[in-house]
Amino acid sequence: MIKQRTLKNIIRATGVGLHSGEKVYLTLKPAPVDTGIVFCRTDLDPVVEIPARAENVGETTMSTTLVKGDVKVDTVEHLLSAMAGLGIDNAYVELSASEVPIMDGSAGPFVFLIQSAGLQEQEAAKKFIRIKREVSVEEGDKRAVFVPFDGFKVSFEIDFDHPVFRGRTQQASVDFSSTSFVKEVSRARTFGFMRDIEYLRSQNLALGGSVENAIVVDENRVLNEDGLRYEDEFVKHKILDAIGDLYLLGNSLIGEFRGFKSGHALNNQLLRSLIADRDAWEVVTFEDARTAPISYMRPAAAV
């Protein structure tokens, strides 16, 4: 049986929020079977818990934000991407502020934290959502699609008319039956343009952003001294974001996601369209792990 998975131990980290610039303490804790990923604002009294579910997404400007009443948790996508990539079904994420720390702008530090805490299999079958037929959403020239696929695959294309992007790969497709999330995707950092930063800061966004936690691009070049981690790091980060956004379904996915210039808003719209179309998906479990199409979820393939 493919079993649900949580953390073996509690682990903590400190960082700053990308958009708020606030210092934040992060604690990842094990959680019981069928809990899902739950964000907990421990700076509030009483503590407010917000499950990482598509229907709890309230804002999608520059990041994915979970909302419950007037309480928010910003920038959940990179941590959720790491949870998805390592197959963590159940965990509590405690935060001392309203935003998940940006760390280095990728999912790599979260992968390291989760692996350091250890993975614990639980005595219940892991539930997967299997895509049964195509579901798509569009907005202008942007598009996001789910299609049936016997495994988990994410394809993405970006289209930036900019000197830094013109000579680089702007399309990537990652089939996780043959590709390691940790090695090939998790280290891709978020990116931003110098020309946008002043405006973003006037909107109280990107207040914690720097070359320490993002790829910063000016009119002609990448400003980070060390350059890029992957030749296709820009589009790989969009894949990382999409994996985090898709994990708001609450379960690992069996199917393919295709995005063209899609962002957090359209990704969430796609999840809501899928959930509403009950004939387009089903929940499945695997009594025999050998029959499962997703191998990267198993502990040996997680590293």
Curated annotation (Swiss-Prot):
Q: List its EC numbers.
A: 3.5.1.108
| Swiss-Prot/TrEMBL cofactor(s) | Zn(2+)
Query: Record's InterPro entries?
Result: Ribosomal_Su5_D2-typ_SF, UDP-acyl_GlcNac_deAcase, UDP-acyl_GlcNac_deAcase_C, UDP-acyl_N-AcGlcN_deAcase_N
Under catalytic activity, the entry for this protein gives: a UDP-3-O-[(3R)-3-hydroxyacyl]-N-acetyl-alpha-D-glucosamine + H2O = a UDP-3-O-[(3R)-3-hydroxyacyl]-alpha-D-glucosamine + acetate
Keyword annotations for this protein, in alphabetical order, are: Hydrolase, Lipid A biosynthesis, Lipid biosynthesis, Lipid metabolism, Metal-binding, Zinc
Catalytic machinery residues? H264 (proton donor)
Its BP terms in the Gene Ontology are: lipid A biosynthetic process
Q: What Gene3D superfamilies would the database entry show?
A: lpxc deacetylase, domain 1 (3.30.230.20), lpxc deacetylase, domain 2 (3.30.1700.10)
Q: Which family does it belong to?
A: Belongs to the LpxC family.
Protein name in the entry: UDP-3-O-acyl-N-acetylglucosamine deacetylase
The organism named in the record is Pseudomonas paraeruginosa (strain DSM 24068 / PA7) (Pseudomonas aeruginosa (strain PA7))
